Amino acid sequence: MDYKELIKIALDYRSRAYIPYSNFNVGAAVLCESGKIYGGCNIENASFGATNCAERTAIFKAVSEGESKIKAIAIVGSLSEITYPCGICRQVISEFGDEDVKVILAKSEEDYIVKDMSEILPGAFKREALGK
């Protein structure tokens, strides 16, 4: 899969964000092991704890459709700088992917960096720690 295609999908989902409080839109696109792609945007709520990030929206959508393993995720924020996933999203990405999951952090289809999951969440807490 071409990273630019995944970024393009994330950019499309970014425009769908529901952000009446922060005015900070984020889009994400997840490539699953099956080859299917799922997109998501951030969705805010007046009760801020009920807000959901774009990364989790995309991953939860994929899991709810029967996916269990992700290979890559593209994330596009609205800043002029690269937008990294929050700590909760890093943990969720780690739950459904290996240490080598590609995390594509983009400003545009032409301006992006690629990190392995192990770079952005070293020492991730995994199910094996629970004896699973």
Where are these regions (language model features)?
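Active-site- and interface-proximal helix/loop "cap" or "latch" segments in soluble metabolic
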Residues: 61-65
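A short acidic/small-residue loop/turn micro-motif
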Residues: 45-46, 120
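Short loop/turn motifs at secondary-structure junctions and domain boundaries
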Residues: 19-22
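Hydrophobic "anchor" residues
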Residues: 36-37
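C-terminal binding/interaction regions
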Residues: 2-16, 67-132
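Local cysteine-cluster metal-coordination motifs and their immediate loop/turn environment
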Residues: 41-42, 49-56, 60, 81-96
